[in-house]
Design a protein with these regions (language model features):
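Short loop/turn microsegments at loop-to-beta-strand junctions
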Residues: 17, 71-72, 142-143
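Glycine-rich phosphate-binding loop of actin/hexokinase-like ATP-binding domains
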Residues: 129-187
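ATP-binding/phosphotransfer module of carbohydrate and carboxylate kinases, centering on a glycine-rich
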Residues: 1-67, 77-82, 99-107, 121-131, ...
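A short acidic/small-residue loop/turn micro-motif
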Residues: 35-38, 91-92, 160-163
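A cytosolic small-molecule/anion-sensing beta-strand core signal
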Residues: 23-24, 72, 149-150
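General beta-strand structural signal in soluble alpha/beta enzymes
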Residues: 109-113
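Short hydrophobic alpha-helix segments
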Residues: 31-34, 87, 157
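A charged helix-plus-loop insertion that forms the helical arch/lid used to bind
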Residues: 81-92
Length: 317
């Protein structure tokens, strides 16, 4: 009888930490979400809080957990267990995340890029297992990406490949946190949704988003108003879809995928921007590349990268 491993998977993004406890049969025993927090101390405290909540929800003893897998935003060095740089978590520059989380939790910890983890999660328990060649974009505070080629995730030389969020849409465009201008994540992320609402609200004086546009508005507010037919919300999602479609059209020309899968928190609003993505891909991608592509969202939504981080740890222990 084979051992049943218990793994915690964490997806640490610029806004939230998503966590799961899962076993090697792929059964999700608990999941939760906490805010990432500002600064290293706050984030480390919230990582501990996330793990404690998962243990409480699953009624699992701390000693029953075999390892923790972390999917981290940004460029990483898996061998050194380090986040090299993460534009949406500025404090994490050459941050030894594996060493730190092992110290504060007592668990063995394994590190993967968050978007690569999302690909692994979707390949294991999601829609990706139905295709051999596909690409994924994770749409959150920023944009991550990943690709499966002939059934295998491609991660590059040191595990940081597929930074789709930093392909250039407009070289004279919006300033990105990475230091460049015109990156896709400036135009197609949850952060971009808020930016575009604020920059276009004067053109829509009757929009219900106007009273909160100058305060703590989030992409969730925009999504909620889009469901009510708010014209500004619908305009912004259409604009987001246009920019995402321009970027994805280039990726289609490079990868010739069977499927394009959207993940991350913003993907829950995909009904309002996916038609425009498809329109742009059909308009801009080359013949022989754009035909017969399936478009879909991740099966497990926001928790796909956490699932993938757990799977990576499971395969590494």
């Amino acid at each position: 009888m084979r051992k049943l491993f218990m793994i915690i998977g964490l997806d640490i993004g610029g806004t939230n930490i998503k966590g799961v406890i899962i076993n090697n049969d792929g059964t999700i025993l608990a999941k939760t979400s906490v805010t990432t927090g500002a600064g290293i101390d706050a984030t480390e405290n919230n990582i501990c809080h996330c793990i404690e909540t998962l243990l409480e929800l699953s009624h699992i003893n701390k000693k029953e957990v075999d390892a923790v897998g972390i999917g981290s935003a940004g460029a990483i060095d898996k061998q050194k267990g380090m986040v090299i740089t993460s534009p949406n978590i500025p404090a994490w520059k050459h941050y030894p995340i594996v060493q730190r989380v092992e110290k504060i939790t007592g668990y063995t910890v394994f590190l993967e890029n968050d978007a690569n983890a999302a690909v692994v999660g979707e390949l294991w328990l999601g829609n990706g297992k139905n295709y051999k060649n596909w690409i994924m974009l994770t749409l959150g505070t920023g944009i991550g990406g990943g690709a499966v080629i002939n059934g295998m995730p491609y991660t590059g030389n040191n595990g940081s490949a597929m930074e789709f969020g930093h392909i250039t849409i407009d070289y004279n465009g919006l300033q990105c946190k990475c230091g460049r201008k015109g990156c896709l994540e400036c135009y197609g992320s949850a952060t971009a949704v808020v930016h575009f609402v604020k920059s276009h609200c004067t053109s829509y004086p009757d929009s219900s988003l106007n009273p909160i546009a100058q305060h703590t508005m989030t992409a969730r507010h925009v999504y909620d108003e889009a469901k009510k037919g708010d014209p500004l919300a619908l305009y912004v999602f259409n604009l987001i879809g246009t920019y995402l479609g321009i970027g994805i059209a280039d990726l289609v020309n490079i990868f010739n995928p069977e499927a394009v899968i959207l993940g991350g928190g913003l993907s829950s609003a995909s009904q309002y921007f996916l038609p425009q993505i498809i329109h742009q891909v059909q308009k801009l991608s080359l013949e022989g590349m754009k035909e017969n592509i399936r478009y879909m969202t991740t099966k497990h939504g926001d928790y796909t990268a956490a699932i993938g981080a757990a799977k990576y740890a499971l395969e590494t222990i």
